[in-house]
Amino acid sequence: MFSEQWGNIKARPGANRLIKHLKSNRVPTAVASNSSRSNIDSKISCHQGWKEYFSAIVGADEVQKGKPSPDIFLEAAKRMNADPSNCLVIEDSLPGVSAGKAAGMHVIAVPSVPKSSDEFSSADEIINSLLDLRPEKWGLPPFNDWIEGTLQVEPWFIGGPVIKGFGRGSKVLGIPTANLPAENFSDVLSEHTSGVYFGWAGLSTRGIYKMVMSIGWNPYFDNTEKTIEPWLLHGFDEDFYGEELRLAIVGYIRPEANFPSLESLIERIHEDGRIAERALDLPEYAKYKDSPYLRNPLQQGNVANGNEAEQEL
């Protein structure tokens, strides 16, 4: 039953980018999973090119013990003729981190459960998502796709009525945000990592504006729910609660982070705004200002399919 759904499961943000980057730089990679080998093959066959990208694939049924035992990782290193001490493991689970460390390898944790980073302290590094990976820290070729402090992402599009948020944007931060009802976008948000993004915002009766947006739990305020908080980089004379807001999210700036003070949080938000302002003038991002999705009233629900909206350009 589960195998029928694997084709609907998208890769984690940044996974395709990382795999292709390592392949193009001739860095051997392997899949080492607690799943059976047949299940691994079925899963990766749903992602174009993945089978050809990996030098080795090891399932739990091919070794004596699965994770947290090191057997899977040691077998993967053996098949690649690699010294375990020269291997870098990227893991999203605690048993996987334990297995990698037990194998004598370097381990980066990318927790799959929100707000669980403290549990992964045994890893050599903890990152919010694969978008935040810096390969050069581990002696690997660096990415060359960052543009003016930003990273292009496959555009995605959401829209809905502007609602009142926590009241912190204007009153506490001096930064008015145009909040959207996150519960309407649970499926979309589950596909995208928390962090600071940017793009274009269309207001049904006003026009199209540059925007920077946070998605996540806001560690400084310790939110209990994942939120979407766009900041339209324009001065408005009045509120626009209830107006239809459409967003084209086209780039990524950084992971969400905690800050030692309110002042440092505000300073960083303004810096994010300046980065977004400059980046959106670049042709790679500026072209999305003309997306029909930003100008046409929403027709079916509150969420647009990113690929379909992009094809309309």
Describe the role of every protein-language-model region.
Residues 30-31, 109:
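Hydrophobic beta-strand core positions in alpha/beta domains
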Residues 154-313:
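Phosphate/ribose-recognition catalytic cores of enzymes acting on nucleotide-derived substrates
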Residues 1-20, 25:
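Metal-dependent phosphoesterase signature
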Residues 6-10, 31, 67-68, 260, ...:
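Short, surface-exposed alpha-helical recognition segments that flank or form part
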Residues 9, 63, 180:
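Short clusters of hydrophobic/aromatic residues that line enzyme substrate/ligand-binding pockets
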Residues 20-23, 36-153:
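Asp-based, Mg2+/Mn2+-dependent phosphohydrolase catalytic module
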